[in-house]
A protein has these predicted regions:
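Conserved HGGG/HGGXW glycine-rich cap/lid loop of the alpha/beta-hydrolase fold
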Residues: 48-97
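An N-terminal hydrophobic leader/cap segment in hydrolases
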Residues: 1-41
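Flexible "cap/lid" loop of the alpha/beta hydrolase fold
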Residues: 141-146, 151-181
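Conserved catalytic-core motifs of eukaryotic protein kinase domains, centered on the activation segment
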Residues: 73-75, 98-104, 165-168
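Conserved alpha/beta-hydrolase catalytic His-Asp/Glu region
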Residues: 165-167, 183-242
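Gly/Ala-rich beta-loop-alpha elbow adjacent to hydrolase catalytic centers
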Residues: 132, 136, 140
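Active-site loop/oxyanion-hole signature of alpha/beta-hydrolase fold enzymes
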Residues: 35-46, 50-53, 88-131
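Short beta-strand/loop motif that positions the catalytic acidic residue
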Residues: 240, 246-252
Length: 255
């Protein structure tokens, strides 16, 4: 592909995001989405632009979302954090609204490399705090292992993938699994599982947030590629001499 072709793909991805943003029902989601900046990375990522929500002033704090989610996962804590920190919320590579033509494969190593490039582009080199939710918790530990001198605190929210070994899902099961996760009834069920009191807390706004990124071109293929890699597992071995706190819900059905 030529540079012009990648540029066109990037523009189409941004156009989809802008359309999705205007359809958001949750005012907190819209508030967060309005702070998205499109960060252009180097040729390693085909010079594409990636969505990163950035707001506030102070010491930097990066928030890492979970599997098959997006930056919108943090809409309910963004405004509060923004009062005291420079908040940075990227979509992980191959997830959310990130362009799916940045690479031919999606795996934990590529995600970490991408995050390091995001931080370098934003010139963040020290005093970085990390909040990682679900799979984002494992991502946080691996990131801190790669750049320990840049990190000073980590908060893990119901972290997933800390133990065990990666389980590669071969073709065509990875594609079948990704297609299954795209079914509306499956999305609704998973969304409800993420809340302790789904009957009271889950409505149209929450269900929309959980699925709005599925319209990104290449969503299924990037998800299948990540599944084929085995994903994050056994990341407790990456724990460094960095202050870490873990917070889990009493009735966390996903964990």
């Amino acid at each position: 592909m030529t540079n012009k072709h990648f540029e066109k793909i990037s523009d189409l991805n941004i156009k989809f995001f802008e359309s999705a943003k205007m359809s958001l029902l949750d005012p907190l989601g819209l508030y967060l989405a309005n702070d998205v900046k499109w960060i252009e990375l180097n040729g390693k990522w085909n010079s594409l632009k990636f969505p990163v929500a950035i707001g506030g002033k102070g010491q930097p704090i990066i928030l890492l979302h979970g599997f098959d989610s997006s930056f919108l996962e943090f809409r309910r804590i963004y405004q509060s954090l923004k009062r005291n920190f420079q908040v940075i919320i990227p979509d992980l590579l191959g997830f959310g609204f990130s362009p799916r033509s940045a690479t031919n494969e999606y795996n934990p190593s590529k995600i970490i490399s991408y995050l390091i490039d995001i931080l370098e582009t934003l010139r963040i080199t020290n005093n970085l705090k990390i909040i990682g939710a679900s799979m984002g918790g494992s991502t946080a530990l691996k990131l801190s292992f790669e750049i320990p001198n840049a990190i000073n605190k980590i908060l893990l929210l119901s972290p997933a993938g800390l133990f065990g070994e990666p389980k590669n899902i071969p073709f065509p099961l990875n594609q079948v699994g990704a297609s299954f996760l795209g079914l509306p009834q499956v999305r609704r069920s998973l969304c409800r599982q993420a809340f302790a009191y789904p009957d009271k807390c889950v409505g149209e706004m929450e269900e929309q947030i959980a699925s709005i990124h599925l319209g990104c071109k290449g969503w299924r293929d990037s998800l299948a590629s990540f599944a084929k890699s085995g994903g994050f597992a056994g990341t407790q071995k990456y724990i460094q001499n960095i202050p870490i706190k873990t917070l889990c819900g009493e009735n966390d059905r996903i964990l």
